[in-house]
Curated annotation (Swiss-Prot):
It comes from the Bacteria. Keywords: Plasmid. This is Uncharacterized protein y4qC. InterPro entries: ThiF/MoeB/HesA (IPR045886), ThiF_NAD_FAD-bd (IPR000594), Ubiquitin-activating_enz (IPR035985). The keyword Kinase does not apply. Signal peptide: none annotated. GO terms for biological process: cyclic threonylcarbamoyladenosine biosynthetic process. GO terms for molecular function: tRNA threonylcarbamoyladenosine dehydratase; ubiquitin-like modifier activating enzyme activity. Disulfide bonds: none annotated.
Length: 583
């Protein structure tokens, strides 16, 4: 560190506008900090401004500070740290590593015309006295402990519903999957149960296991409570040593592994407290084998394994509006560019079971607007989606029904069309038709009306200048009523207009090797329709009493001359007097 008065600005700071702005900061700080202002000369040569100084307060106190300016200054704020013991000050404003919260976290609180000197003058005393403004959010210590281990690709899964207050120690039964990767030792694990010191059961996992935790190796490891556990500080070895304890190792994939868990009361949300989980790990890698003495081992290496929460309340916490999908079964017919994104979004948002029907194969040409990529080439669409969904969204089970509606069955020994449709629609709560085939839509309308099921149909115009998402209540307008509403018997427009381009088939193409003409359109336009389908499904299942009349939502995406932002209109669809669904 060099005194500011002796500091010669290097070219990295002197020749750029951002560098000159940093130098102006030094002048302002020097006016208050005086001779205490020191500049890291080595960092400055690389264009980094790192400084230390003593800041005088109006009450006579002088506070030692360190500041580092990001490369993105002045658009983003400098980071300021205490050089004294931060435990003397309120922890909500002064982190255990000394970081000061002079402003709220949101970047909007810092403006490019502000200076650190002005900020310290206005806010430092309030921060140190605990009288400054606070962000209305919790300070969970597990987040900071997890950050020490995120580069490893490892995790342990827990459930926020477990209540362990009043207990000091015990054991956890852990399903452990260990492997050696390019980035080091990877541990993927899930706690199956939590027990007190006397063996009594305190909590048990009910969430389905993700595919990444596929091991059958269940091991018992210790847990203990430490409500005085602080944020991680100091050297990595000292820090991890606080939580990496225990004596029992298990052998996994060429290494001896020891896990230990520390539970600490923490602020999970603003002024709401609960238990934080921290996982310490020690690994002894096997480096060679001896016929007499067994494997030789490297020294133990302690580390942190991030703890993540994947219980039912944890998965749905960020989006409470999709709670209606839990416990529901939804059938999706047609898994092309409209149906595949809808199926994945329904799974992502918590649908318990999907029944998927298609009989097409994913080809390379599909990939430009299909939901999955090259790893699915050559796979039946329903099978590819089943594998993907059950691997990535383990709370959703998938029934894949291979069938193309309308094909005759010439073999009495295999299930026929009626059998396949019964399998598809068994116990479902809602049907989504993404077949883009009017005949199939009419058939599903008939079947859903007979079964008392609601149907959502989605389709796009051949040139993708528009499309529609239609809700059909079993006692309101059906797909045939929709056809009557679009066009009169004389060929004139009905009271519900077609989407733009609906009757323009001039842009249909037949790619080489494809047996059918197909529409031209991009995934980013098609997803407008797929996502509206999911929104409608969530709304219908959330408030079924409000959805007693069929409804047509028509979107236009193109005005012939150019693409435009989606423009929606909504029309009720009553039963048409000329439709047989009235009888």
């Amino acid at each position: 560190m060099k005194p500011y008065t002796d500091f010669e600005p290097p070219p990295a700071l002197a020749v750029t506008p951002a560098g000159r702005r940093r130098l102006a900061e030094l002048q302002k700080l020097h006016s208050a900090a005086g001779e205490s202002l020191l500049v890291d000369e080595e960092a400055a040569a690389a264009g980094i401004l790192r400084i230390e100084f003593s800041w005088p307060l109006n009450d006579g106190r002088t506070i030692g500070l360190r500041a580092v300016y990001p490369d993105t200054f002045p658009r983003l704020r400098p980071h300021v740290f205490l050089t004294c013991d931060p435990s003397e000050y309120p922890e909500r404003h002064c982190g255990s590593e000394g970081a000061l919260c002079l402003l709220g976290r949101d970047t909007r609180y810092w403006q490019a015309n502000m200076s650190l000197a002005e900020l310290l003058d206005e806010n430092l005393a309030h921060v140190l006295d605990g009288t400054g403004a606070e962000d209305p959010q919790g300070e969970p210590i597990e987040y900071w402990w997890n950050s020490l281990g995120q580069a490893s690709g490892s995790f342990v899964l827990v459930d926020s519903r477990w209540k362990l207050s009043g207990y000091d120690e015990g054991t956890v039964d852990v399903l452990v999957n260990a492997s050696r990767t390019e980035i080091g030792r990877t541990i993927r694990a899930a706690i199956l149960s939590v027990r007190a010191g006397d063996g009594s059961l305190l909590g048990e996992r009910v969430a389905p296991l993700p595919a990444a935790v596929s091991s059958t190796a269940i091991r018992a490891f210790p847990w203990r409570r430490d409500d005085q556990l602080s944020l991680p500080t100091g050297s990595a070895e000292q820090t991890v040593g606080k939580v990496a304890y225990g004596k029992t190792y298990v052998t996994c994939d060429g290494a001896d592994i020891r896990l230990s868990f520390t539970i600490s009361r923490t602020e999970l949300q603003h002024n709401e407290h609960g238990d934080a989980w921290v996982c310490g790990m020690a690994v002894r890698e096997h480096i060679s084998h001896s016929s007499r003495r067994g494997p030789r081992r490297k020294d133990t290496v302690p580390s942190i394994v991030p703890v993540f929460r994947d219980g039912e309340i944890d998965i749905g916490y960020r989006v409470p509006s999709v709670a209606s999908l839990r416990g529901k079964r939804i059938a999706v017919v047609g898994l092309g560019a409209l149906g595949s994104p809808a199926a994945v979004e329904l799974a992502r948002n918590g649908c318990t079971s999907l029944h998927l029907m298609d009989d097409d194969v994913v080809e390379p040409g599909n990939t430009i607007r299909w939901e999955l990529g090259a790893s699915s080439w050559g796979t039946k669409k329903q099978d590819a989606l089943k594998r993907f969904i059950e691997r990535e969204f383990p709370w959703t089970s998938v029934l894949a029904v291979p069938h193309r509606i309308g094909l005759p069955n010439c073999d009495p020994h295999i299930p026929g069309e009626t059998d396949r449709l019964n399998e598809l629609l068994d116990s479902v709560d809602l049907v989504v038709d993404a077949s883009a085939a009017p005949g199939v839509t009419y058939l599903l309308g008939d079947i859903c009306r007979e079964r008392g099921l609601s149907l959502i149909s989605v389709f796009a115009s051949p040139n993708l200048h528009g499309g529609a998402v239609v809700f059909h209540h079993p006692e309101s307008g059906c797909p045939v009523c929709m056809a009557h509403a679009n066009e009169t018997p004389e060929g004139k427009s009905g009271h519900i207009p077609y989407p733009n381009g609906m009757n323009d088939e001039s842009t249909l193409v037949q790619p080489p090797g494809c047996s059918e003409l197909t529409f031209t359109g991009a995934s980013f336009d098609l997803k407008e329709l797929s996502l509206e389908t999911v929104r409608m499904a969530v709304d219908v299942l959330s408030s079924p009493d409000e959805w007693t009349v069929s409804e047509v939502r028509t979107v236009n995406l193109h005005n012939v001359k150019r693409r435009m932002p989606p423009s929606w209109r909504i029309d009720p669809l009553e039963r048409h007097p000329d439709c047989g669904c009235r009888s």
